[in-house]
């Protein structure tokens, strides 16, 4: 099957799981639930879920387990975007062509919606049925995710990003910001699948880390390019000056070259993985 069709299948599947999970919660008519749903279904590409299901195919992880992991990761991702957009953070009024959660539902409700999605993610990972996943594996998965989004991961990335607004930043510093802010959640998504499998090898884990981090950074640069193009046509470019991005620091052409380099890294990682295990061909 062509990967595009597989991607669409994965995207449809996780959207159904997210919809079902949120609809099972109490207080469906509350502004909190409405804000949570609004943010989760605001046009996400579900890239992290696609990586989860694809990695699960490689390591023969039960689809039910992959559903649990994908749901948890997508809720974490949505929570992070809600908080990123808040006036005290990036102060963005739009997200994926729609008004941000805090503009539609207010800051206090948006803050709570992000908090609720984060706690829901861990509740799902803690309590949902995952075939052949022992309690020891489950604890390892929870530990991995909590580490990757806290002060040693995503939250630190956001903090570094906020601090960077006050000074000049070089390419190396920008890569560190995006490593923590974006790539660590991507890495965690792939790691959770591997930790839930019946395999474990430090060498394979290192390959998976290289692959997922490279994909995460490439995705961030592409996002920066798209934002740069959109913001460049606007008369008010204060945000462009305020935020440090790849196009601003190294230019559009070098940013595109950087994406190609990262794609090459990710493919080399997959080739290394092929030498150790059998990988499905799409």
Curated annotation (Swiss-Prot):
- Phylogenetic classification of the source organism: Bacteria, Pseudomonadati, Pseudomonadota, Gammaproteobacteria, Enterobacterales
**Location (main, coarse):** cytoplasm
Keyword Magnesium among UniProt keywords: yes
Sites binding (2E)-geranyl diphosphate sit at: 95, 181-182, 220
Cofactor(s) required for function per UniProt: Mg(2+)
Q: Record-annotated residues binding Mg(2+) 1?
A: 84, 90
Chain sites annotated for binding Mg(2+) 2: 84, 90
Q: Which organism is it from?
A: Buchnera aphidicola subsp. Acyrthosiphon pisum (strain APS)
- For this entry, the protein name equals Farnesyl diphosphate synthase
Q: Which gene encodes it?
A: ispA
- Compartments where located: Cytoplasm
One GO cellular-component annotation of the UniProt record comes to:
cytoplasm
What PROSITE patterns would the database entry show?
POLYPRENYL_SYNTHASE_1, POLYPRENYL_SYNTHASE_2
Matching CDD domains, A to Z? Trans_IPPS_HT
Q: Could you list this entry's UniProt keywords, alphabetically sorted.
A: Cytoplasm, Isoprene biosynthesis, Magnesium, Metal-binding, Transferase
- Does the keyword Transcription feature in the UniProt annotation? no
